[in-house]
A protein has these predicted regions:
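Charge-dense, helix-prone N-terminal extensions
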Residues: 1-105
Length: 105
């Protein structure tokens, strides 16, 4: 199971930037909406997306592979790509994250 942002439909333009740790090491990729805000963080085995608090709580209760986001904090979730959550669900969450991020000022 492999998540590829290039296969994500239903979103507009975005840019990609390398995500570095505090030590300057490659940690993953940041995907940025046109308003210069991150909507997705992709690491080797996880992705992080922006959600609302209610959805975040529901997903964490429903799936063992979903936890609070390290990048977004309580405003997002981090999903371990273990196969517990379907790829379609993950693409839906990424779409939602993009749309929520676009609405931010």
């Amino acid at each position: 199971m492999e998540f590829k942002v290039e296969n994500l439909t239903g979103i507009g333009e975005y840019s990609k930037k390398e995500f570095l740790s505090k030590k300057g090491e490659h940690e993953g990729e940041l995907f940025i909406a046109p308003n210069d805000k991150v909507f997705l963080v992709q690491r080797k085995n996880t992705i992080e997306v922006r959600t609302d608090r209610n959805l975040s709580k529901l997903l964490r209760e429903q799936y063992e592979s979903v936890m609070s986001s390290r990048y977004f904090g309580i405003g997002g979730v981090e999903v371990v790509m273990s196969g517990q959550m379907s790829l379609d669900e993950i693409y839906d969450m990424a779409r939602l994250s993009y749309n929520l991020t676009k609405e931010l000022e």
